[in-house]
Design a protein with these regions (language model features):
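Feature marking well-ordered beta-strand scaffolds used for ligand recognition
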Residues: 1-403
Length: 403
């Protein structure tokens, strides 16, 4: 049961002798599980690594993780009360930690650590590492509100150094008057409509593709790694995303070897909602659509939306007529996608098919799409797991326990 800790992002590593290990970040937990999945029908937990002292940093989570070039790189950061059960005043550690897994994949050795500089902040969220010298982060930063784009040089993994950063101008709080920007943002819904990088910053060649909440897709030229420059943008919010939804633009994934990119708006977790919540207050009523979008990036200075992904097929035996109102007694919830599979060129053990998109929805399971024709997208298959019986940490659950 993964030591009683629910996994979040997972990274697969293939050893030189053909074994497979899954390194699991934690949605609510201060460390990483190491799972031997060489026999995928018999996964076995073989180690647990702690990122910090949980007594000193009780609010720390390890949500995101990357593996490449014999390194495991894990992110740490804080949580929010309604998602993670963190209590006011709980301390958290915002960092990136680098481990050697080539020498001993079961017992990763800590090589170096880098801290964001923000005390008890959100820390590092999604990030990109395809091997090599640089790690591309979505992370908080002193003097800014919300996560910005930060670039680390890890040529010496024992001493990571920040070498570049980029942000939307209104994130630079030292340039604004107090009251012009959200304070303690992650605890307040208005922060969801403030520019910030969700990530990961997906890098192909000298271009970085950023999923920037209400700012949509932003494309940067990073040929000078120390001075990223904006060259293109496509906003998606309005008509897409808003109100009770999650990250307004969650992921922007270029399809391998193609001039197309898939962007997503994040839905939200239905267990945290019910009819009363959805029909009262300033965010009540019809919820904007959250979806997967196909974007033409053949001209990075002029990205254009060219197609929408189809609504997930509803199983014949599903207890509700659709996923938007599932378990909500007729009210509409913020249904939509969450994570998509991220193929990377330096990770050949991952599926690299440029004509497939794998997406996990909130309570609609994993969906597999054929995108060989970018204008006529077809759903090929789906898997919806059983609903959970309980949560592994203490938070209010006013809505239905849906997977």
């Amino acid at each position: 049961d993964l030591n009683g800790v629910n996994a979040f992002q997972m990274a697969l590593h293939k050893t030189d002798d053909g074994r497979y290990y899954m390194y699991c970040g934690s949605f609510r937990g201060p460390g990483w599980n190491v799972v031997d999945v060489t026999d995928p029908t018999q996964p076995k937990v073989v180690n647990w690594l702690e990122a910090c002292d949980p007594k000193e940093y009780p609010a720390t989570n390890t949500p995101k993780i990357q593996v490449a070039d014999g390194l495991m790189i894990g992110a740490t950061g804080g949580g929010v009360s309604f998602l993670h059960g963190c209590k006011p005043g709980d301390k958290s550690l915002g960092s990136l930690q680098i481990f050697d897994i080539k020498t001993d994949p079961v017992h990763p050795k800590l090589l170096g650590k880098w801290e964001t500089g923000v005390e008890n902040g959100m820390g590092v969220h999604r990030f990109f590492y395809n091997g090599g010298r640089y790690v591309h982060l979505s992370a908080d930063c002193p003097g800014y509100t919300g996560n910005i784009y930060r670039i680390l040089d890890i040529i010496d993994p024992t001493h990571p150094v920040e070498v570049g950063r980029w942000w939307v101008p209104c994130q630079f709080t030292d340039g604004l008057k107090e009251g012009e920007y959200p304070v303690d943002g992650p605890q307040h819904w208005e922060f969801m409509d403030w520019p910030q990088l969700h990530g990961p910053p997906f890098v192909v060649g000298n271009l970085a593709y950023l999923s920037y909440y209400c700012e949509g897709l932003i494309i940067l030229d990073i040929s000078d790694i120390t001075r990223p420059k904006k060259i293109g943008q496509l906003q998606l919010k309005g008509p897409f995303s808003g109100k009770f939804a999650g990250a307004r633009t969650h992921t922007c994934l270029p399809l391998p070897g193609r001039n197309f990119l898939v962007a997503t708006n994040e839905g939200e977790r239905f267990p945290f909602y019910n009819k009363e919540i959805l029909t009262t207050g300033p965010r009540k009523g019809a919820q904007p659509m959250n979806n997967l979008h196909m974007i033409d990036i053949s001209d990075p200075t002029d990205p254009q939306l060219v197609a929408e992904f189809p609504y997930p097929e509803v199983p014949e035996n599903y207890p509700w007529p659709n996923f938007n109102t599932a378990g909500m007694d007729g009210a509409q919830g913020p249904f939509g996608p969450h994570n998509i599979h991220e193929p990377m060129s330096n990770k050949p053990w991952l599926d690299q098919n440029p004509n497939r998109v794998y997406c996990c929805y909130f309570h609609a399971g994993m969906r597999v799409y054929d995108v060989s024709d970018p204008y006529y997208i077809k759903e090929l298959a789906y898997f919806i797991p059983p609903n959970p019986e309980k949560l592994l940490f203490d938070i209010p659950v006013p809505g239905p326990m849906l997977a």
